[in-house]
Amino acid sequence: MKVEDKGHTTILKDTRGSSSAFLAKVTEQYNNYKGKNLILDLSQDGELSLNGMLAFLPLSNKHRKAKKSLVLIAPNFDYDDAPEEMVIVPTLLEAHDIIEMEEIERDLGF
């Protein structure tokens, strides 16, 4: 797992191509990242299934309850299959854009 801090956001990149192992590692180390917006980059995992993505839902919900953003990057995923409460985008740029928009919404009290 590769970790990169950019301002108020931490980017966690899966380097092994296994979303389940990546989720286990992120969950194990969650206390290190809970105060930051998170981008989880799953672009190395070419075989992401709906069930594989849904495994991230509890972590996403937990992070959002703490008033922080969690965005998943999955370029080869059918976004229409994902539940509305999950934010899944194809690129890092879009992930940063989503976080900026959510930060503005929180600042405005939405």
Where are these regions (language model features)?
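Short acidic-hydrophobic, aromatic-tinged amphipathic segments that line or gate anion-handling sites
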Residues: 87-93
